[in-house]
């Protein structure tokens, strides 16, 4: 059979890439050339056509139906792909996955008649881009060291003997796919990085960072630029053209361990009883210039990543902890928002200026809380003697602002954050619910005011910008919230109408201190749309604000740095048309990149926290605790302990006779009549903890069996 006919026959059976065709019919330079000549001839004769590098027969019409997708989830016998625009996903049965891996870009054809009515199913026609870097665990299986990917722990791949990289059974590793097979299990891999034991949370966290290409070490060119600022100081020349505020008793308030200090404050009362609030933010844009290696790297990272006691900074420490950080007692360049508020806390006006400041003291939240509560000793009062007189006014202003937030219906959802306590070796030895006091709330409100002013400034000036946007919840999420509220005995209309934030706030206030408080807080958090960055102002649903942006953390967030750069140009007199030409594309790209990287950072932080919680739980296997049912599924119950650690109780361990799920809120045993409902308390025993996967299993303690 001629090469032309072979290729036509092959493509009739299955769409193929050039790589596929050369693999089947080529092998050397001569035969590869014949393959390409035959392909060119078939295209010229309009027998085959190309889509995204994949060849189809024209008669089949399949090219027009093919969809560009990304593999987002892989199971033992299935995969899910997401359309390129992120609008919907498609289920791929195992025999149609072609060995694709998460992260691969693929071409997919949907089935006309899916097995489940109303669902989207299809097959992968071709793999266009391969993601060959994977993270997982080395496991000895049937006498051979194999690789089990985190993305699909149900499968294992062959670790090539000469590419094991010193890995041992149970090690957390990163691998590269060296040879692909037709099934995922047929892929052959080699170790690219060994992190250490998968039973240590700190090793698993490092692997999570590696999987998303987040590196603690900065590229050489970035480090070279940063080194030039290693011992930098603010000179008198640097202060030219800036408002000189160094004589004012400005100070910072942060946690004791904070080294990258973005913001400082000062507050004075006016003779009329109003307030002059100054929020002074590190002028990072003065040091990170457009087009520099520092700026390119900051754009790529977009955010600092925080987990346990570690941080992977957006900027090198020479800037984040050095010349940009508003450290105590040294001159620093700042971007200041100077606000005037009336005696009731209403914002009257504001202005933005470039300034030079000297922070008087590095305030600590716990110490400020003690001063506000009147429980501080003389030594502590002495530390804050230069700024002590501001605290009563700050407390008063915060009281007014808290009242105004409540009046407009601003939501106050408890996030349920925890604090991980580590030993000197970095192992988690305790988990505690994170608490915050009055000073934390004060600083949050003052920063919110400055952020609001920045967004208002941009909208009034009609300049390109990066806004923080939070849209109202969608109908599907509201339906789930409605079901949850009904289960907790709370009547609402959310299944039909979008609630106002004020209505949601009223529900939160109504359950505060009760058994359903944490469950409903969590339910509302899950109901909310994800806040994102956009170049158009669309308001902030949760804060009930027309204008909002992120201005106050340019050391750790790129959107803040981006709008500093844009606002600086406007303050220097750049006209609107020039600003639109220069910054419109920049604002759009910064918004997109920052939104994407923020999601990745949040996922890493959440997964790392789960690993540390599991590490803590391993120390307490066999111990009993009281917990509350925080989630109900057909498979079993999620139980949250008082310290925020959550585990799973399989339905099979609840009763031997089987259970029945009622609207996602209750499991019932129809034989014995036992019920397990959201919000119920129960005694559990910790029976398993998988640090690698961040999963904890509980069993019902005998004394709590009902």
Give the ranges of each region predicted by the language model.
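Charge-lined substrate channels and their catalytic hotspots, especially those that engage the 3′ end
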Residues: 1-278, 285-331, 369-372, 615, ...
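Electropositive polyanion-binding surfaces
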Residues: 23, 174, 179-180, 197, ...
């Amino acid at each position: 059979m001629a090469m032309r006919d072979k290729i036509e026959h092959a493509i009739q059976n299955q769409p193929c890439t050039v790589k596929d065709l050369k693999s089947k019919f080529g092998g050397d330079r001569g035969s590869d050339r014949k393959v390409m000549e035959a392909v060119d001839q078939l295209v010229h004769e309009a027998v085959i056509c190309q889509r995204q590098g994949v060849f189809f027969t024209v008669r089949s019409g399949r090219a027009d139906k093919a969809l560009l997708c990304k593999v987002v989830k892989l199971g033992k016998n299935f995969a899910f792909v997401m359309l390129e625009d992120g609008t919907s996903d498609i289920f791929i049965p195992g025999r149609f996955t072609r060995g694709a891996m998460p992260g691969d870009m693929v071409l997919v054809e949907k089935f006309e008649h899916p097995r489940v009515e109303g669902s989207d199913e299809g097959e992968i026609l071709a793999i266009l881009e391969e993601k060959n870097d994977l993270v997982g665990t080395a496991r000895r299986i049937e006498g051979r060291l194999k690789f089990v990917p985190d993305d699909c722990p149900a499968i294992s791949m062959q670790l090539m003997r000469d590419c094991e990289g010193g890995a041992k059974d149970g090690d957390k590793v990163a691998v590269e796919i060296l040879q692909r097979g037709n099934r995922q299990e047929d892929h052959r891999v080699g170790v690219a990085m060994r992190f250490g034991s998968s039973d240590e949370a700190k090793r698993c966290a490092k692997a999570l960072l590696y999987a998303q290409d987040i590196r603690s070490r900065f590229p050489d060119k970035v480090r070279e630029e940063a080194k030039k600022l290693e011992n930098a100081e603010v000179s008198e020349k640097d202060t030219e053209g800036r408002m000189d505020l160094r004589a004012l008793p400005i100070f910072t308030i942060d946690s004791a361990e904070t080294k990258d200090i973005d913001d400082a404050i000062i507050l004075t009362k006016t003779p009329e009883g109003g307030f002059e609030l100054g929020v002074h933010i590190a002028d990072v844009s003065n040091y990170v210039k457009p087009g520099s290696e520092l700026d390119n790297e900051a754009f790529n990272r977009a955010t600092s990543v925080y987990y346990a006691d570690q941080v992977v900074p957006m900027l090198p420490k020479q800037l984040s902890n050095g010349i940009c950080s508003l450290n105590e007692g040294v001159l620093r360049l700042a971007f200041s928002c100077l606000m005037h508020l009336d005696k009731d806390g209403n914002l009257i006006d504001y202005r933005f200026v470039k300034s030079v400041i000297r922070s008087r003291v590095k305030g600590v939240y716990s110490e400020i809380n003690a001063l506000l509560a009147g429980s501080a000793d003389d030594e502590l009062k002495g530390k804050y003697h230069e700024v002590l007189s501001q605290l009563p006014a700050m407390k008063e202003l915060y009281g007014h602002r808290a009242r105004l937030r409540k009046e407009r219906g601003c939501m106050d959802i408890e996030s349920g954050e925890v604090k991980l306590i580590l030993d000197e070796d970095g192992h988690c030895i305790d988990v505690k619910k994170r608490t915050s006091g009055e000073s934390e709330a004060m600083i949050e409100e003052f920063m919110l005011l400055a952020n609001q002013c920045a967004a208002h400034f941009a909208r009034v000036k009609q300049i390109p910008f990066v806004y923080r946007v939070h849209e109202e919840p969608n109908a599907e999420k509201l339906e789930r919230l409605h079901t949850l509220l009904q289960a907790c005995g709370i009547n609402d209309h959310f299944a039909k109408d979008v609630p106002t934030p004020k209505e949601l706030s009223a529900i939160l206030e109504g359950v505060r201190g009760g058994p359903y408080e944490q469950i409903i807080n969590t339910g509302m958090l899950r109901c909310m749309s994800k806040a994102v960055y956009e170049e158009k102002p669309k308001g902030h649903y949760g804060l009930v604000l027309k204008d909002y942006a992120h201005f106050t953390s340019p050391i750790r967030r790129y959107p803040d740095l981006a709008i500093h750069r844009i606002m600086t140009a406007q303050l220097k007199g750049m006209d609107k048309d020039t600003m639109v030409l220069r910054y419109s594309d920049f604002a759009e790209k910064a918004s997109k990149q920052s939104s994407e990287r923020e999601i990745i950072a949040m996922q890493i932080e959440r997964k790392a926290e789960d690993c540390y919680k599991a590490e803590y739980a391993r120390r307490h296997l066999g111990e009993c605790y009281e917990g509350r049912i925080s989630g109900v599924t057909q498979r079993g119950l999620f139980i949250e302990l008082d310290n925020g650690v959550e585990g799973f109780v399989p339905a099979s361990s609840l009763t031997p006779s089987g259970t029945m799920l009622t609207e996602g809120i209750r499991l019932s045993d129809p034989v014995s009549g036992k019920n397990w409902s959201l919000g119920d308390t129960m005694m559990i025993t910790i029976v398993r903890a998988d640090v690698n996967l961040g999963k904890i299993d509980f069993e019902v303690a005998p004394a709590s069996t009902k």
